């Protein structure tokens, strides 16, 4: 997590595996490829936060709900960390609203095959499913596609600015996400029943 000031605004930049919650305004930003970010807020209390995560698993099912899968447990853990932090800062769960971003499918090369090639849509499907299951309204979303995104979540008015990034930079982000995904898969192989939060090495 990095803190910066840009044109007088306080910007908090989060990386994969991180989240941030604030009551004092400011902007939370992140760079997304296949990962997803959920922006959650309670407009009555003024509490807002964002996470950045990636589901990692060898196998994905088109029919089984993700919340029941090994990878889904990690996603649930990431979402609950954010929600619990929001509530500790004064948000009420029934007041939470969401916006979701990311989940791009970026192929580093056209010959790329395997589960990583669908991980973006898997992440997008998970975040929609989780929010629906928890009864948290999804007010807006920019999910999937073939380009990475930089997002800026303004926690003073809960607006989100989305900027699609160029193909070359999207490919760099895809390599980062693949490393994160492989690290997560290896962790599941070693401890298949554990749920861990991790950062790219």
UniProtKB/Swiss-Prot annotation:
This is Probable chemoreceptor glutamine deamidase CheD 1. It is an enzyme of class 3 (hydrolase). Probably deamidates glutamine residues to glutamate on methyl-accepting chemotaxis receptors (MCPs), playing an important role in chemotaxis. It catalyses: L-glutaminyl-[protein] + H2O = L-glutamyl-[protein] + NH4(+). The keyword Hydrolase applies. It comes from Geobacter sulfurreducens (strain ATCC 51573 / DSM 12127 / PCA). InterPro entries: CheD-like_sf (IPR038592), Chemorcpt_Glu_NH3ase_CheD (IPR005659), Cytotoxic_necrot_fac-like_cat (IPR011324). PANTHER family: CHEMORECEPTOR GLUTAMINE DEAMIDASE CHED 1-RELATED (PTHR35147:SF3), CHEMORECEPTOR GLUTAMINE DEAMIDASE CHED-RELATED (PTHR35147). Keywords: Chemotaxis, Hydrolase.
């Amino acid at each position: 997590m990095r803190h910066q000031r840009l044109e007088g605004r306080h910007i908090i930049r989060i990386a994969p595996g991180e989240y941030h919650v604030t009551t004092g305004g400011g902007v939370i930003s992140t760079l997304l490829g296949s990962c997803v970010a959920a922006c959650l807020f309670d407009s009555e209390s003024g509490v807002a936060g964002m996470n950045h995560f990636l589901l990692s698993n060898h196998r994905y099912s088109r029919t089984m709900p993700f919340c029941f899968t090994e990878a889904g447990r990690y996603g649930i853990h990431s979402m609950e960390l954010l929600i619990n932090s929001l509530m500790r800062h004064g948000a009420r769960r029934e007041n939470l609203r969401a916006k979701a971003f990311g989940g791009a499918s970026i192929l580093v090369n056209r010959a790329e095959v395997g589960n990583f090639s669908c991980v973006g849509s898997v992440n997008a499907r998970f975040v929609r499913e989780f929010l629906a299951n928890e009864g948290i309204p999804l007010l807006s979303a920019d999910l999937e596609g073939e380009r990475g995104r930089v997002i800026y979540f303004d926690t003073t008015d809960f607006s989100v600015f989305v900027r699609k990034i160029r193909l070359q930079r999207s490919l760099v982000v895809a390599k980062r996400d693949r490393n994160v995904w492989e690290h997560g898969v290896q962790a599941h192989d070693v401890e298949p029943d554990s749920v861990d939060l991790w950062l790219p090495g």
